[in-house]
Amino acid sequence: MTVKITPNDRGNPPGKLADAELHFTEGPLEGLKLIGFSIWEQRRGGGGGRNVTFPARQYNVNGERRSFALLRPIVDTSAQDGVRELILAAYAEAEAAAAA
């Protein structure tokens, strides 16, 4: 699996750094991609960290906007954490390559 990073050069919405896609290179998902990941500047704590949002579908219930995660852990969140770290590492590589 590879991660494709598309930088957010327009700066809109504020705080969004890039979009990410997972491209599957082997196994039953070979030739497919999973889109909808975004990398954001972390707003809380002022630590300058980064956050990854996962693909989700938004919908309304009684006028309230809600979100339904499309990629979910089966049992615990460690698998989700691994994908998050993979995307952040790919973004760091893309950022370093752009600065070089």
Task: Report the location of each language-model feature.
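Single-stranded nucleic acid-binding surfaces, predominantly the OB-fold ssDNA-binding core
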Residues: 1-100
